[in-house]
A protein has these predicted regions:
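Bacterial N-terminal signal peptides that target proteins for export
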Residues: 1-9
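Bacterial N-terminal signal peptides
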Residues: 9-17
Length: 184
């Protein structure tokens, strides 16, 4: 009896172990797909769009975070293709699918859509929201530091386009200070 219990325990352990390895393998495979998509984005945007749609069709409903990331990359592709309406829709969808409800990079991307359309005040609002979110994150997190620098640089470009040159200079200097602080 004791031997049967031990055998069942060992069998259950191995099944769990195999299941964990498979799940980890699937996660690595999906991560590779995302990396491939990002690489394709720069080389062949049309091919990247086809690949992204294929991956989206193969996703399980519980893979919302990966779906959000793929939708975000699709939005970035459409920004690069100067199709802002389509890009904006993908960024909105990505934000809704994301587990992180306040994603500052999503705000940056939406701001980029408005910037591309010369809607300076809409873009400025999104960049300010992103900057606020990045400032609330732990200060030395690399992603947070880079995000603050990007938001500040984008705000400077907005102010330059609005011909508020003094404000633009302040934002550019602050962005430079953030980047210098990161280099230490």
């Amino acid at each position: 009896m004791r031997s049967i219990s031990f055998n069942i325990f060992v069998l259950a352990y191995f099944l769990l172990l195999i299941g964990g390895v498979k799940a980890q393998g699937d996660a690595i495979y999906r991560s590779t797909e995302l990396d491939s998509l990002k690489s394709l984005r720069l080389k062949s945007p049309q091919r990247a769009v086809r690949y992204a749609r294929q991956v989206l069709n193969e996703l399980n409903p519980e893979q919302l975070e990966l779906e959000s990331k793929i939708l975000n990359v699709l939005g970035e592709i459409y920004v690069d293709l100067y199709l802002p309406s389509i890009a904006l829709q993908y960024f909105i969808d990505a934000g809704q699918k994301s587990k992180v409800r306040k994603n500052p990079w999503n705000k940056i991307n939406i701001g980029n859509v408005y910037f591309q359309q010369s809607q300076w005040l809409e873009a400025k609002e999104r960049y300010l929201q992103a900057l606020d979110m990045f400032r609330r994150q732990s200060g030395q997190k690399e992603n947070s530091v880079i995000g603050r620098a990007v938001a500040l640089s984008n705000l400077a470009r907005i102010e330059r386009n609005l011909k508020n040159y003094d404000d633009a200079l302040v934002y550019f200097k602050e962005a430079l200070d953030v980047k210098r602080g990161q280099a230490k």
